[in-house]
A protein has these predicted regions:
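Bacterial Sec-dependent N-terminal signal peptides
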Residues: 1-27, 195, 199, 209
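Repeated loop/turn-to-beta-strand initiation elements of outer-membrane beta-barrel proteins
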Residues: 22, 59-62, 104-107, 152-158, ...
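Residues that define the transmembrane beta-barrel architecture of outer-membrane proteins
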Residues: 22, 42-46, 87-91, 136-142, ...
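Residues on the lipid-exposed face of transmembrane beta-strands in outer-membrane beta-barrel proteins
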Residues: 26-30, 48-56, 66-68, 91-99, ...
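Structural signature of outer-membrane beta-barrel domains
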Residues: 31-35, 69-73, 114-118, 161-167, ...
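Flexible, solvent-exposed loop segments that connect beta-strands
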Residues: 37-40, 70-89, 117-138, 167-186, ...
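Glycine- and aromatic-enriched membrane insertion/assembly motifs of diderm outer-membrane
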Residues: 40-79
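Predominantly the C-terminal beta-signal and adjacent terminal strand-loop region
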Residues: 74-75, 139-209
């Protein structure tokens, strides 16, 4: 799958560049991230990247994005009385379809494919690298959200990312660290808030993200 990512991106953005009305921009913001596993809490993280917005006719549009996004979770009292915090950095590619509603609102939904670039966990300030055995490199999910377009250049987006892939596997151990033979799996759950800035706006001053 990794070898397919580059040509897919090339094709998508090449198609967009052929359209006179296609717009390009950058975006960045905050993530409230968690993994749906027992005793997990959300962590505050970030995301940043670029997008291309292509009108398809009427009020319908297609928007591919390429983001660096940090996700993860915090497990309460995981190691005796200490919390365990996971931080995972992904290269994410949302491919959303949407519709303009009125002059300022855009609703969108679509798949998101992510590849894990780095990750680690922290117990009471002590950091460690993630053991590859317990993590999935790839994540696939569904994104849905809404954008409020303040001006032709600036917009605010609220989006929820619902992961389908078990990205983390936690083993159950006793107080001596002995494997008890069980494990728990979890999927990414992320609420995103971002600000978007359009760099180029083609030939049409349309409402865009």
């Amino acid at each position: 799958m990794k070898t397919l990512l580059t040509p897919v991106l090339f094709v998508l953005f090449s198609i967009c560049s052929l359209k006179a009305q296609t717009t390009f921009g950058v975006k960045g913001g905050l993530n409230l991230a968690s993994i749906n596993i027992d005793n997990s809490d959300m962590i505050l993280a970030w995301q940043a990247g670029a997008f291309s917005h292509m009108p398809l006719g009427g009020k319908v549009f297609f928007q591919p994005e390429l983001l660096i996004s940090r996700k993860g979770t915090r497990l309460k009292d995981f190691f005796y009385t200490s919390d365990l915090t996971f931080n995972i950095v992904y290269l994410s590619m949302p491919l959303v379809m949407g519709v303009e509603a009125g002059e300022h609102f855009l609703f969108h939904i679509g798949p998101e494919l992510s590849y894990r670039l780095a990750g680690g966990f922290e117990i009471e300030g002590q950091e460690s690298n993630i053991d590859k055995e317990y993590y999935s490199d790839w994540d696939f999910g569904l994104d849905a959200g809404v954008t409020y377009q303040m001006t032709r250049r600036f917009g605010l987006t609220l989006r929820y990312c619902f992961g389908f892939t078990n990205v983390m596997q936690i083993k159950f151990v006793d107080e001596l660290g002995q494997d008890l033979g069980g494990f728990s799996e979890g999927k990414n759950r992320v609420l995103q808030a971002s600000i978007n800035y359009t760099i180029s706006s083609g030939n049409k001053a349309s409402v865009i993200e």
